[in-house]
Amino acid sequence: MTTIQDIADKMNISKSTVSKALNDAPDISETLRKQVLETAVALGYTKLRRYKKPVKKICIITEKENIQYEEPHHFAYDILLGFRQMAEPAGFDIEIVPVDVQMQRNQRYDVFMLEHDYVGAFAIGFSLNDPWIQEFKTSHTPAVLFDNYIIGNPSTAYVGIDNDEGMELAVSHLAGLGHRKIAYLSGSLGSQILQIRHA
C-alpha cells in the first residue's frame, strides 16, 4: 500500500507537505496540490482517513450535456432517486456532480475522486467520446456505469437494461395493437447503448 512517505520520496518534498496538500491546507499552492494528487493517484494511494469517517461519500456523476435529472419527468430522475434511497440508509452521503467534457479533460477521474474524498461513483449519461469513459478502463476508484460497459477493470461495474427484451416487448405491444409498420428512431450512435440497440 502506498504511503504519504512514498509520495514525498517520489516528489522530493517533505512528508508534511504531502499531507498538507492531500488535506487542502491553505499554505499549499494549487499547482503543488495538483502535482501531489496526480502523483498520489499514479502511485495508487488512497486516503485512509476517508474510510474512517462515519459517513462515506459517493458521487453520482452526470454528463450534463447528455442527461437530465432535476424534474420528475426527466429520464434520470427516478434512477438517481432510487440510488439515493438505497445508499443513504446504508450510511453513504450522496452528492450529484454534473461534469462536462472540458472538466473531464482538465482533471483525471481518480484525481477528482481522491481530491473530493469520494469512495466511489455512479456515472450516468456518458458517451463513448467522453474522456472519463477511457479512464474507467484503468481507474482504481470504484465506479458503477449506467448503460456503459467496461471490460477488464475490477473497479468498474455496469448496470443497465435488457435491450433485447425491451425491444421485443415494445414491438409485441405495438403489433398487438394492430401496427404493422414499426420503426425505431435513435439518437446519434455516440453512446454504447444506442450502438447496441442499433445492431
Task: Give the residues covered by each predicted segment.
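A short acidic, amphipathic alpha-helical/loop segment
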Residues: R108-Y109, P131-F136
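Short, flexible/disordered intra-domain loops and linkers
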Residues: N66-H74, Q104
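N-terminal helix-turn-helix DNA-binding module of bacterial transcription factors
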Residues: M1-V55
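Structural motif
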Residues: I94-E115, M167
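Bacterial carbohydrate/catabolite-sensing allosteric modules
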Residues: M1-D6, K10, A42-L43, K47-R49, ...
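Short beta->alpha connector loops
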Residues: D100-Q104, I124-N129
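Periplasmic-binding protein-like
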Residues: Y118-G125, A183-S186
